[in-house]
Every structure is written in structure tokens, then in C-alpha cells.
Amino acid sequence: MVRSLLPLSWRRCASDSSNSSTNDDIIVDYDGPDLPLPEYPNRPNEPLGMRKQRLLYQSRKRGMLENDLLLSTFAHKYLKDFDEDETAIYDELINGVSNDWDIYYWATGVKPTPPQYETDIMELLKQHVKNTEKVARFRQPELTYYL
């Protein structure tokens, strides 16, 4: 039996399988114009070292190779020196945005960065993406722990 935890505004329909006498197969369809995205959970009591560890890992596992390379090399180079506020801004940047392509387009200058993400950290990321030092970035750096 499938139990839905979705809001009531979602429409649930049982599959039309003639072989099944139960409603085990559920198709979920959203009626609204935009799919609501869950908010990223705030972690107010997370120690700074653990937060940096999490962000270092999350910078490596973005779901698209372009951001994996850009963000993992960025985090490897700068994250260890971020204070608590800068770390929170970076956390919001990589986890508050629902689409990794947005981060990529903003960092590469293809699209303008929205005002809420136009921060010193974003500017640092944009400079990192320009790669004025001509560093070869063909693979992610080794994991480094900050605890």
C-alpha cells in the first residue's frame, strides 16, 4: 500500500491495471502552474567544521560534471578560509538554488545573477571560473577534511 505524504492540492489516481485489485500503484499529478519545491533546511546548530565538510562533499556531487568541477575546485581552494558568514552564504548559494544550471550560467556570466545571490562569494566564484591562472581542471581535487 502506498501512503501519500503530498499536499491535498495534488491529485492522486490509481493505475488502471486490470490485474491488480488494490491501489498499490499511484500516479501523482500536480495541478498547479509551478511544481512547489521544498525549502532547504536551515541547520542553525551545525558546527562550522561539519558544515564545511558537508559543503565540500556537496560541491563535488552536483549532478552535472561542469558544476562538479567548478564547485569542487572552488571549495577546495577557498572554503577552508571562509568564516561562518561566508560559509552560510556559500551554503545558501549551492543548496538554496533549485537548478544547478542556474549556478553554472550565473558563474560563467551567461545569465545575470539575481540580486539575492550577488554576493562576494558569487564574485569570487565568477573570478574562479575565469581561471586567469590557466589551471587545468579535468578532475576533482582529493577530499580534504577541515575538522
Curated annotation (Swiss-Prot):
<dbReference type="GO" id="GO:0006121">
    <property type="term" value="P:mitochondrial electron transport, succinate to ubiquinone"/>
</dbReference>
<dbReference type="GO" id="GO:0006099">
    <property type="term" value="P:tricarboxylic acid cycle"/>
</dbReference>
<comment type="function">
    <text>Plays an essential role in the assembly of succinate dehydrogenase (SDH), an enzyme complex (also referred to as respiratory complex II) that is a component of both the tricarboxylic acid (TCA) cycle and the mitochondrial electron transport chain, and which couples the oxidation of succinate to fumarate with the reduction of ubiquinone (coenzyme Q) to ubiquinol. Required for flavinylation (covalent attachment of FAD) of the flavoprotein subunit of the SDH catalytic dimer.</text>
</comment>
<comment type="subunit">
    <text>Interacts with the flavoprotein subunit within the SDH catalytic dimer.</text>
</comment>
<keyword id="KW-0496">Mitochondrion</keyword>
<protein>
    <recommendedName>
        <fullName>Succinate dehydrogenase assembly factor 2, mitochondrial</fullName>
    </recommendedName>
</protein>
<dbReference type="Pfam" id="PF03937">
    <property type="entry name" value="Sdh5"/>
</dbReference>
<dbReference type="GO" id="GO:0005759">
    <property type="term" value="C:mitochondrial matrix"/>
</dbReference>
<dbReference type="InterPro" id="IPR005631">
    <property type="entry name" value="SDH"/>
</dbReference>
<dbReference type="InterPro" id="IPR036714">
    <property type="entry name" value="SDH_sf"/>
</dbReference>
<dbReference type="GO" id="GO:0018293">
    <property type="term" value="P:protein-FAD linkage"/>
</dbReference>
<dbReference type="GO" id="GO:0055070">
    <property type="term" value="P:copper ion homeostasis"/>
</dbReference>
<dbReference type="GO" id="GO:0034553">
    <property type="term" value="P:mitochondrial respiratory chain complex II assembly"/>
</dbReference>
<comment type="similarity">
    <text>Belongs to the SDHAF2 family.</text>
</comment>
<keyword id="KW-0143">Chaperone</keyword>
<dbReference type="GO" id="GO:0005739">
    <property type="term" value="C:mitochondrion"/>
</dbReference>
<dbReference type="InterPro" id="IPR028882">
    <property type="entry name" value="SDHAF2"/>
</dbReference>
